[in-house]
């Protein structure tokens, strides 16, 4: 790890902590709950969200480093949105469509930007294939064991697949 890698890792860890605190604040409003979910007990303070976002952001920065920083563009949104969606799913067993759509757009923009910056179209191709493969695997699992995963998961899995596969062969 070079000095530049250490600076990038530290900066993205701190940025992740700040984003995690903002996410935790947004979660505390319980704005994601529907009318029929308002009476459910409070999920608690969710102290783990800023720690999870910071750790995931720092680990991704450490993994890719300065040399491969464009690959952070499609993968960092997983660190930022993942704990947020997990906290909501743990509370109401549902993934909000608007948050999934925002996450999908951010990942798609990140994939496109990484492909343009590096001049490597294979990043976008790998992301598209990864998203499709992840969805097909989900679809098969849903047919084998119906009810094990919801369609919120089905909408989220291609996003994860696209972000993860965007960097698989770089």
Regions found by a protein language model. Give the residues of each.
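A membrane-topology feature that recognizes alpha-helical transmembrane segments
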Residues: 1-170
């Amino acid at each position: 790890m070079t000095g530049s890698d250490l600076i990038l890792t530290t900066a993205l860890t701190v940025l992740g902590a700040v984003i995690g605190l903002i996410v935790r604040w947004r979660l505390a409003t319980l704005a994601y709950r529907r009318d029929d979910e308002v009476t459910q007990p409070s999920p608690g303070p969710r102290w783990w969200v800023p720690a999870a976002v910071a750790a995931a952001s720092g680990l991704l920065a450490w993994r890719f480093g300065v040399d491969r920083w464009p690959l952070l563009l499609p993968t960092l949104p997983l660190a930022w949105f993942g704990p947020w969606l997990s906290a909501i799913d743990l509370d109401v067993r549902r993934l909000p469509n608007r948050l999934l759509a925002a996450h999908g757009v951010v990942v798609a923009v990140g994939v496109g930007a990484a492909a343009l910056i590096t001049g490597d179209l294979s990043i976008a191709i790998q992301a598209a294939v990864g998203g499709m493969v992840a969805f097909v695997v989900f679809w098969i699992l849903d047919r084998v064991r119906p009810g094990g995963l919801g369609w919120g998961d089905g909408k989220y899995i291609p996003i994860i697949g696209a972000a993860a596969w965007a960097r698989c062969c770089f």
